[in-house]
Amino acid sequence: MRVVIAMDSFKGSLSSIEAGKAVAEGVRRADGAIECAVCPVADGGEGTSAALTEGLHGETVRVRVTGPLGEKVTAEYGVKGDLAILEMAQAAGLPLVPQDKRNPMKTTTYGVGEMLRDAINRGCKRFVLGIGGSATNDGGAGMLQALGFDLLDKDGNPVSFGAEGLRVLAKIENKNALPALKNCVIRAACDVTNPLCGENGCSAVFGPQKGAAPEMIREMDGYMRNYAALTKNLYPESNLDTPGAGAAGGLGFALGVFLHAELMPGIEIVMEETRLEEKIKNADFVVTGEGRLDAQTAMGKAPVGVAKLAKKYHKPVIAFAGGIEKGAEACNKAGITAFFPAVRGVTTLDEAMRPETAAENLAESAEQVFRLLTLR
């Protein structure tokens, strides 16, 4: 019997690979002859870079870059051959900004551009970039500046960091952009479809969680429209209504237009890079899961992405989760054959989330399920 194990991380407890290895341990306890293939899974959010880097046996690189408030921070990204695996949140994520200093007028994506530049200097030509969890609403302007694009005011001076820089933006030039960008293929893990501007745009929808008040939201939306109009002078094909343009405070717009990146669901990128489909083709069972299974899981999170791929080849899918919430039955309709809670008995959340406890709970649950599946 062949089993493919593609677990998402149990946030705050186990990484994707750690969760997968725990399940594999349980499966082998049930029957040591079962072949287990553990693959990393992530949906493009926090932990995607670490999961994919570990799963591909890549190298973790640490680099000092400009943080969201202009301070220096240490960012990590993965490298495997000519592939770089990055998360914008490492350089411009909301957790890097204290609650009382959250102000998207000031926060910048400059460090994201520095990460990309560092990876390019290391010889990378293919990029996977997770763009969730941003603290910014600068339309990716900071990233572009770090990559050599000139964003200038009416006097020809570089605009300042943050959305407030877009307020005085009068001209965009690409003649000094990093030449190596022409040879780069970038895929951005993007799970939102918001346009750049308007009531569903980045300022209106995501601005409040980044510290924007109603008046600031209106101002930033106006700045974004000006930015989009100036961009159209340079790139006539650009469109502020492109699905995903509003991702990460407009970073999706800059990536798609200036860097010709492809915006696609994170789970699809991860599954493609790990060649999960090839492994599933030859499997008898597929195992997936995450920390909590609920109605949101069925809306396209990693376990359902795995299940849809397995369904293509008519493979049964078993899911394990730390917690099963109301609405989880929607996962059955989305392709998960059966799901099981991994927590055994009444316990506290802190105890259940201890890595050694979570791993053993997963192993024990997997063992019991596969004892039944291997019954002769």
Task: Give the location of each predicted region.
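N-terminal loops that bind phosphate or other acidic moieties
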Residues: 1-131, 135-376
